[in-house]
Curated annotation (Swiss-Prot):
ABC transporter domain sequence ranges: 453-689
Naturally occurring in which organism (per UniProt): Emericella nidulans (strain FGSC A4 / ATCC 38163 / CBS 112.46 / NRRL 194 / M139) (Aspergillus nidulans)
Annotated spans, Disordered: 41-96, 694-721
Residues that, per the record, bind ATP: 462, 486-497
Mitochondrial matrix side: 18-127, 197-245, 292-357, 414-721
InterPro entries from the UniProt entry: AAA+_ATPase, ABC1_TM_dom, ABC1_TM_sf, ABC_transporter-like_ATP-bd, ABC_transporter-like_CS, P-loop_NTPase, Type_1_exporter
Compositional bias per record (Low complexity), positions renumbered to this chain: 61-89
GO cellular component terms, A-Z: mitochondrial inner membrane
A biological process from GO: intracellular iron ion homeostasis
Protein name, entry field: Iron-sulfur clusters transporter atm1, mitochondrial
Catalytic activity, EC: 7.-.-.-
Transmembrane segments: 128-149, 173-196, 246-269, 271-291, 358-376, 392-413
Record keywords, A-Z: ATP-binding, Membrane, Mitochondrion, Mitochondrion inner membrane, Nucleotide-binding, Transit peptide, Translocase, Transmembrane, Transmembrane helix, Transport
Amino acid sequence: MLRQAAQTRCWRTPARFVSHRPAFPRSNPVSAALGGTQFRKLSVKTQTDKNTLSDKKTAEADTSSSSSSAKSAAPSQQKTQNATTAQKNLLSESTVANKEQRKADWAIMREMAKYLWPKGDWGTKLRVGTALSLLVGAKVLNVEVPFYFKSIVDSMNVDFAAVGGTAYTVAGSMIIAYGATRIGATFFQELRNAVFASVAQKAIRKVARNVFEHLLRLDLNFHLSRQTGGLTRAIDRGTKGISFLLTSMVFHVVPTALEISLVCGILTHQYGIKFAAITATTMLAYSAFTIATTAWRTKFRKQANAADNRGATVAVDSLINYEAVKYFNNEKFEVARYDKALKAYEDASIKVTTSLAFLNSGQNMIFSSALAAMMYLAADGVATGSLTVGDLVMVNQLVFQLSVPLNFLGSVYRELRQSLLDMETLFNLQKVNVNIKEKPDAKPLELKQGGQIRFENVTFGYHPERPILKNASFTIPAGQKFAIVGPSGCGKSTILRLLFRYYDVQEGRILVDGQDIRHVTIESLRKAIGVVPQDTPLFNDTIEHNIRYGRLDASDEEVRKAARRAHIHELVERLPEGYRTAVGERGMMISGGEKQRLAISRLLLKDPQLLFFDEATSALDTYTEQALMQNINSILKEKGRTSVFVAHRLRTIYDCDQILVLKDGQVAELGSHRELLDLDGIYAELWSAQETSLAQDPEYERNAGLEGETAGEVEDKAPRQ
């Protein structure tokens, strides 16, 4: 059986076949093949070095020594670790000193001021100017209301029978003016809100778009270590805080100061320094108490925000991994995790509410004391004859007129502090450094040689203490089918990530058709590369959308042609909704094999010059895999594309022009399938181990028969010479 299995004919292209040498069993073949190498799970946690070190070493890549590279990479990697730690703490809402917090708050307010008065945007400036004019008009009318009220009261303090008048003849004009003034103030205020609405919404849109755009520019490491639920919740709170901050800056802080100044001036001019002194003292005491108490309350709000982020993270994580929760019956565990986060939020929210009650009580006590003192002075003036009853009413009205902006200012300050806290995370996201950057003089990638890829003395590691690639050098010839094999954690997928510039090398350089990838534009580089990754990323949308994502301007016919080449068109057509069928969150409504074929069709639609298949057919059955690979091989041969296959199952890649064997981050072997078998090294050991395992599999005979039938069909269809 073993000899028969080893001699089974396999295909390479429709007209080319090879026979494998017999796979003789050896003692402990797996451990012998790996040479005791420990299988390691790829764990991406830290960010690689920036471009500086790589650029410095480009010219001397071939002569770089391991000792110098270790010394050079250490500071960079330490800096990267610190940056990663900062990223992890991004949503922690840690408490900072008041001085630092005020500095951060002012920075946010300065940033938001740019959206209030943007350069060159005269439409926004006109709206802000109009809103401010309406604001001033509304405040002036508000201050006039007590004057009319005083006149009405004083004019009514007569003997109507003696003068023979009516309310209209005595105070009619004042009553009309009173009503008109209040209506005018309200009209100006509402018109102001309508005029300013587009300014606030436009600012929210710009900030949210900038943050989203920046998140898409951040490196892979940030997105691998992010907390999706907490991140989205922080962004949501931050965008809501923008509207309040802009409104408070224009309509609350400035107008309240204006109204207080007007009232103090009127009281001083009309009633003397005592009234103005009480008013000024009240303002100072009220403001000082509000600021001090709110600063004390800030830590409770930060604790609540952090707990809210944790709760959102737990909820989203559990729902995304719904199947895993069900597989292991861990519903109660997930509910307990979520409840723990909710309990932390509950405790923090109780502190926020109780501290708010203390703040409101103190504010009310200060204002009520001032009101009582001013009413006493006014009543004393009426008793001595220096003031009229209308003056008493006017003082009362003016003080109450102040109560509205004062109480509003207190609540505004509280909400402003909360908005600033909510926006802090939003703006901190924009400050996260983009480590993978283009050079100012970067040029588009030009594929003049067909897409040759060359790694020269490349050293790279996600952790300083564990390099993944160590001085690796190899060339992927243009237009050839190339494979990379090796044990888990040896750097197979890392090669793709480095070529795609998810990370930059720490030593050495990577060339595509003789061009250092750090010297070309990122967009042109990534446009030339197509990838089918291990975990197929799909959007919660239709099958058609997920295929067309490879090239958004593709026609319906082009989408279906790509699906046919990926052997999924017939399956899609049998679905009730066809190409309009939704795939669900992360494609969970379709099988793993269907997801992989969708990913392949998306890649074929993109039609790049360089193609990477990272375990692209691992979820397919043998027959479907062979039929699909025949199609892919014919496309690669027809268009002369450079292709790289990363695989653990050697039967899927033995027909490649060259096979690279990685071990411990270094190139261990390189050659064709037959050359590597003749070498009798690591590849031969792996091949022997897998063939032995297949021969002992009860399903092997059936699969071998399918392979033979497929090979026979292809041979029959092959052109005869």
